[in-house]
Every structure is written in C-alpha cells, then in structure tokens.
Amino acid sequence: MIVTPTSVKGLIEIKSTITKNAIEQLLIQSNSDVSKELPIDTKFNLLGTKSTISPKTVCKHIMEIYKDGDIVRGLGVIYSLDWKDIIIFDTRNDEYIAHVLNNFDYGVSSFVNNLLFQIYGSEVYLSIANQIGPSLFIPKERYKIR
C-alpha cells in the first residue's frame, strides 16, 4: 500500500533508549526535505523504553538546537517508560512551547491519548476520555522553544 505524504497525520519513532543523539535524530527528521512534503500539522513523536536523560534535559537540548535553526515540522509528544513525566509540545500565539507534565503513573496510555488527540481531534479524544475517565496532568515545567 502506498501512503501519500498529504495523508500522514503524525510519525512515531520508537527507541530502546532516549539519548541526546536520539533527540537530535528526531529533530533532523522533522526538519528534513521530506518533511516539507507532509501537511503542516504533522507531528513527530518519540517513545522510548528507557532513557539516559531527564525530560528537563530533553527540553533544554531541543532549545539549544532550535536556537538559531528553523522549525519545519513540530514535535508532538516525547515519553520514556521510565519517566514520571511526559513532554507535550504546543503551538499557540506564535509560540512553540514544551510542557513537562506529571504523568501520575499513567504510563504509555498518556502517550497514546495525546496521539489520538493529534490524529483524530478533540471530539474523538473527549469521547474516549469520557468512557475511561478524565486524565489529570499537573504542569511541572514550561520551556519556550520559540
């Protein structure tokens, strides 16, 4: 089956270990020439089973890399199964923000919930949330990337 670039809603990269190098690779992919053919709202997501860096370090590293560079396609969610927090990226009022939220041991379900929101929109997300119960996230840190 052939998938046209315009039908891609998001990409998920799965790594055994989230490292600074894995973050750099994700950013290179999201800013590649191929990414320019994807819809503007396409998000790049990263899921790892473990990590060598903290969510705070991930955000600071992304800020360093994007300090002088262009952002072609945004990031969606970065999560490692050994973290207590989840990183969710948001664009509002011409700002590109990384939110570090307390995940409350929801584990990978928080990652999947955010993907559902990205891909299917708020109606599907809220429909599922109403059936399984609300998710509670407490913001811990906020990083303005741009």
Task: Locate each region found by the language model.
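Intrinsically disordered, low-complexity Ser/Thr/Pro/Gly-rich regulatory segments
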Residues: 1-146
